Amino acid sequence: MAVVYAHVSDDILAVSLERVCLQNHVSIPEDLSIISFNNSLFARSTSPQLTSIDINSKQLGIEAASQMINHIENPNLVATKIIVPHQLIERDSCCKING
């Protein structure tokens, strides 16, 4: 069987997907590789553990608060683009595609 990939927008949804797959005898990661988003506690508490993208939520919050404070203090200030580093946390819900 070909390996299928699912990128799920949130760890909680990925946990639900993982549960449904296992109930229907879909093997993770052999039949379906799952990558989730947020790298929350949920990603680490499943079996197999979910591969997840860590969006660096603490830094994201700091930058958002800073932007809001700057805008309140200087209403004419133009918003600036800020890129917060993210990281792929590889766990057990993905496998390499051979071929």
Model-derived regions, located:
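Flexible loop/turn connectors
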Residues: 1-99
